[in-house]
């Protein structure tokens, strides 16, 4: 039976209570900020140039030297940093999984708002939990990158793409916590 057919059979007296404007506005802001975090994280992972140290540019996907002319190597072993090739593979994988978890979390949040049924509260909670998982993966990738290149790291050496990933990770955390909090306020656990 279609959704229209189910609603047509529902008696008029059993209408679900409408959400307040404030609650809908907050949930919309959370969804919008998560979408921004997904875009920031995706661009940051795809570009991957995260650290400029002296005349070397370290990225998730390749390593470049910028002496007279820029020469890039896909073989990260050419950077002469122990464990960089294997470590960057792990950082890339964790970062990509963080983006995937954030996309699924965003999908759950949006579906819970578009299809208001008895399961929409569970969908909102699942979306928020997936955002927390995405935050953990994203911050783990950032931390792994910094640990791998700890000898080359300076605060001004981080590129815009690194700070995009950092901001995306922070936004994922804030929105996951906000999503769980607004859900606990509006729908107390039974």
Swiss-Prot record:
Keywords: Calcium, Calcium channel, Calcium transport, Ion channel, Ion transport, Membrane, Transmembrane, Transmembrane helix, Transport, Voltage-gated channel. It is found in: Membrane. The keyword RNA-binding does not apply. The chain crosses the membrane at residues 25-45, 96-116, 131-151, 155-175. One of its GO terms (molecular function) is voltage-gated monoatomic ion channel activity. Coiled coil: none annotated. It is a multi-pass membrane protein. One of its GO terms (cellular component) is monoatomic ion channel complex. It holds the Pfam family TMEM37. It comes from the Eukaryota. Its main location: membrane. InterPro entries: Tmem37. Belongs to the PMP-22/EMP/MP20 family. CACNG subfamily. The L-type calcium channel is composed of five subunits: alpha-1, alpha-2/delta, beta and gamma. Thought to stabilize the calcium channel in an inactivated (closed) state. Modulates calcium current when coexpressed with CACNA1G. This is Voltage-dependent calcium channel gamma-like subunit. The gene is TMEM37.
């Amino acid at each position: 039976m279609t959704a229209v057919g189910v609603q047509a059979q529902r008696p008029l007296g059993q209408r679900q209570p409408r959400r307040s404007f404030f609650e809908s506005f907050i949930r919309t802001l959370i969804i919008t900020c998560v979408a921004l975090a997904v875009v920031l994280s995706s661009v940051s992972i795809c570009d991957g140039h995260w650290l400029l140290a002296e005349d070397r540019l370290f990225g998730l996907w390749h390593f470049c030297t910028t002496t007279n002319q820029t020469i890039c190597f896909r073989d990260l072993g050419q950077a002469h940093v122990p464990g960089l090739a294997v470590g960057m593979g792990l950082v890339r994988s964790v970062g990509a999984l963080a983006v995937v978890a954030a996309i699924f979390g965003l999908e759950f949040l949006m579906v819970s708002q578009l299809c208001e049924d008895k399961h929409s509260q569970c969908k909102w909670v699942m979306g928020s939990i997936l955002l927390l998982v995405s935050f953990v993966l994203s911050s783990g990738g950032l931390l792994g990158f910094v640990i791998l290149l700890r000898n080359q790291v300076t605060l001004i050496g981080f590129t815009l793409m690194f700070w995009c990933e950092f901001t995306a990770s922070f936004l994922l955390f804030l929105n996951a916590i906000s999503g769980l909090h607004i859900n606990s306020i509006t729908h107390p656990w039974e």
